[in-house]
């Protein structure tokens, strides 16, 4: 087993919910959490600024020698370029896929409301993933 910690970041403290869930399902894993409370919220910023902040957050976690990075931030998850994520030296995931899957699994009438920051909604990422999951 890889002894390195899992890295989790958010634009604030909301990602601590993800950390709590990780601790529940992976009790033996160490976790490094970075909450960027100095620049919260990310969602009112432009795309380039959000990506710049995400890069800085990721660099910080990589400096802590993490084995996996989770962006527990809907804004970063919907804005960070997938091609950049693919080039990282460790696996990277965000929250869009898991959140969209939970919404699709929970709906009874195939109607899902999306509440998010301006940047998250503007990205269209949740709508795209949800539509792909329900095959509309």
Where are these regions (language model features)?
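Extreme N-terminal starter segment of soluble prokaryotic enzymes
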Residues: 2-6
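A short, Lys/Arg-enriched amphipathic alpha-helix followed by its capping loop at the start of a domain
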Residues: 21-29
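A short, N-terminal amphipathic alpha-helix
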Residues: 53-68
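Conserved small/polar residues in nucleotide/adenosyl-binding loops
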Residues: 134-136
């Amino acid at each position: 087993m890889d002894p390195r910690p899992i890295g989790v970041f958010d634009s604030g403290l909301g990602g601590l919910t993800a950390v709590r869930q990780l601790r529940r399902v992976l009790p033996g894993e160490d976790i490094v959490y970075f909450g960027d409370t100095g620049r919260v919220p990310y969602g009112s910023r432009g795309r380039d600024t959000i990506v710049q902040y995400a890069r800085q957050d990721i660099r910080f976690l990589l400096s802590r020698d993490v084995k996996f990075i989770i962006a527990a931030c809907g804004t970063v998850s919907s804005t960070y370029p997938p091609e950049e994520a693919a080039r990282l030296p460790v696996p990277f995931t965000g929250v869009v896929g898991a959140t969209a899957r939970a919404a699709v699994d929970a709906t009874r009438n195939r109607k899902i409301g999306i509440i998010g920051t301006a940047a998250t909604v503007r990205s269209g990422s949740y709508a795209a993933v949800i539509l792909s999951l329900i095959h509309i």
